[in-house]
Structures are given as structure tokens and as C-alpha cells.
Amino acid sequence: MIQEQTMLTVADNSGARRVMCIKVLGGSHRRYAGIGDVIKITIKEAIPRGKVKKGDVLKAVVVRTKKGVRRPDGSVIRFDGNACVILNNNSEQPIGTRIFGPVTRELRNEKFMKIISLAPEVL
């Protein structure tokens, strides 16, 4: 459950380390984002010589949340932290070429097959 001002870790090699959600996209007064939702983020911490720099405003898709996601069989998949993958503002394709950590199958429904194929583990 991600809302404005939430800090997230970045699960790709785009060069960002920590980002902050500044807007939940999809609806005029939408408050929360879950796994598979697109958010607007700003880079708060980045490594030198990365593809993005501190202060950049980009889109990202949420791939892991502490709140987790409920499956139709009643099971819940939760993670230790909140993480996202940074997207290109125009094409909504990932900026990074590698994904770190597991992602959930729910991304498959949300047109993020590129992230699924790059991820080391799909739960």
C-alpha cells in the first residue's frame, strides 16, 4: 500500500537507490497503490554515473509491498519492504536492464511482461 511521500527501494540497475512517491496514477483522487500499479516518483538517492540522477521525476511500477497481495485462493504474498522498477516516462518500459529480487505473477496481467522476463524469480 503505497501513497504520496512513501519511500521505496529500487529493484533495478537504473542507478537510483531510493525514490519517493509523489503521485498515485490512475484516477483523480486515488490514494493508494499496490503491486502492479504505476506511480510518479522522484529520485532521492542515486549512484554516480547511473542512468538517472537525483531530482529526476519519472514513472515507476510497484513490484513489492509490505502490505502484500491477496490471491484468489486466499493466500497472501508479503515482502519485507516496498520496491519499484523505474519506467521510461513515454514508453512505460523499464529503464534498467536487470531486476533484483522476486516479483509477483500479478505483473503479468498489467502489461509488464518485460519485467517478468528480467526478474530472477516470479512468485
Swiss-Prot record:
GO biological process, one term: translation
Keywords associated with the record: Ribonucleoprotein, Ribosomal protein, RNA-binding, rRNA-binding
Lineage: Bacteria, Pseudomonadati, Pseudomonadota, Gammaproteobacteria, Enterobacterales
Entry keyword annotation includes rRNA-binding: yes
Organism expressing this protein natively: Serratia proteamaculans (strain 568)
Signal peptide per UniProt: none
Annotated Pfam families: Ribosomal_L14 (PF00238)
SMART domains tied to this protein: Ribosomal_L14
Listed GO MF terms: large ribosomal subunit rRNA binding; structural constituent of ribosome
Job of this protein: Binds to 23S rRNA. Forms part of two intersubunit bridges in the 70S ribosome.
Name of the gene this protein is made from: rplN
Family: Belongs to the universal ribosomal protein uL14 family.
One CC-aspect GO term: cytosolic large ribosomal subunit
InterPro entries referenced in this protein's UniProt entry, alphabetically: Ribosomal_uL14, Ribosomal_uL14_bac-type, Ribosomal_uL14_CS, Ribosomal_uL14_sf
Protein name: Large ribosomal subunit protein uL14
Quaternary structure and partners: Part of the 50S ribosomal subunit. Forms a cluster with proteins L3 and L19. In the 70S ribosome, L14 and L19 interact and together make contacts with the 16S rRNA in bridges B5 and B8.
